[in-house]
């Protein structure tokens, strides 16, 4: 019998996470914010099948030393396009809104955490505003052709031939079953993943509209066309970079993480024995690695 249980220390000033909305270019951008505003900022960008909710455990940890801001991208979570605004769901447009959001928030310099769809949004911010980026953490946020698995075959076909039939073939990626699969595939113990993660994500897809997600899947090919420009940014600016990757991601291969070192030799690469949504199963490891990396790279 253990007579010396580990003690639990409750901080004198526990981190409070604020939930706010900011109107930007006809979009009501919902975001989570925590930490001292005068501390170095970390901007968290989620991906497909998710929202800022995926950072619910990470934010309080980072906010002990950093100012943390996590918006929901247009088309996801609690962010809403205002009536009559009109909106083209492309990655250029998503990035323009998030860029305007950072300006409205007064985020002059920030470290980026990018995941999945958040990566092409974040890459555009970095390429267009290299002076604002203090560091990069990529958690299964792809930037290289070799990082794309065979799971992209249907998308590649639709990019090459954007017919109505090829577009319709992408609809299956937006079902509840597929969303759940993206959370659980490659995970050793699926009981670690709370079911509300994929349920909330799918509810948002249905509320906002499946066609929005179809538009983004079709537009993803344009991100690959911009890789050369992104690699030039990496070579020229050498931002402190940590690629921390679920090694059994069905869409983004480990080779995509290793490739960061080609253009940025000082990039740090780490692998976790899990799938795409590594933060759901290895959140503590990611938080610890991020804090150590950010402390080395930008201080607090």
Language-model region placement:
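Active-site glycine-rich loops that stabilize anionic/oxyanionic intermediates
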Residues: 47-50, 116
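Flexible "cap/lid" subdomain of the alpha/beta-hydrolase fold that forms the substrate-access gate
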Residues: 2-29, 34-37, 41, 69, ...
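Alpha/beta-hydrolase active-site loop signature
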Residues: 49, 74-77, 143, 275-278
């Amino acid at each position: 019998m253990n007579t010396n249980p580990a003690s639990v220390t409750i901080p004198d000033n526990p981190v409070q996470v604020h939930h706010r909305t900011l109107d930007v270019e006809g979009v009501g951008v919902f975001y989570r914010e925590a930490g001292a505003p005068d501390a170095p900022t970390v901007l968290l960008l989620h991906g497909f099948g998710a929202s800022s909710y995926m950072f619910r455990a990470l934010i309080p940890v980072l906010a002990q030393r950093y100012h943390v801001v996590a918006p929901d991208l247009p088309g996801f979570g609690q962010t809403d396009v205002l009536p009559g605004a009109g909106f083209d769901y492309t990655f250029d447009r998503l990035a323009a809104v998030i860029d305007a959001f950072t300006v409205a928030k007064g985020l002059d310099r920030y470290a980026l955490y990018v995941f999945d769809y958040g990566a092409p949004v974040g890459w555009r911010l970095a390429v267009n505003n290299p002076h604002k980026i203090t560091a990069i953490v990529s958690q299964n946020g792809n930037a290289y052709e070799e990082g794309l698995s065979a799971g992209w075959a249907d998308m590649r076909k639709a990019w090459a031939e954007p017919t109505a039939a090829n577009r319709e073939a992408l609809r299956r990626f937006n079902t509840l079953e597929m969303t759940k699969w993206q959370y659980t595939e490659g995970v050793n113990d699926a009981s670690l993943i709370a079911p509300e993660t994929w349920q909330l994500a799918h509810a948002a897809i249905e509320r906002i509209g499946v066609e929005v997600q179809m538009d983004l899947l079709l537009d993803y090919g344009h991100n690959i066309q911009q890789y050369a420009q992104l690699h030039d940014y990496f070579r020229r600016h050498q931002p402190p970079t940590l690629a921390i990757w679920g090694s059994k991601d069905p869409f983004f291969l480990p080779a995509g993480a290793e490739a960061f070192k080609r253009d940025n030799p000082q990039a740090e690469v780490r692998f976790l024995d899990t799938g795409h949504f590594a933060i759901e199963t290895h959140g503590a490891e990611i938080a610890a690695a991020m804090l150590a990396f950010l402390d080395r790279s930008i201080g607090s």
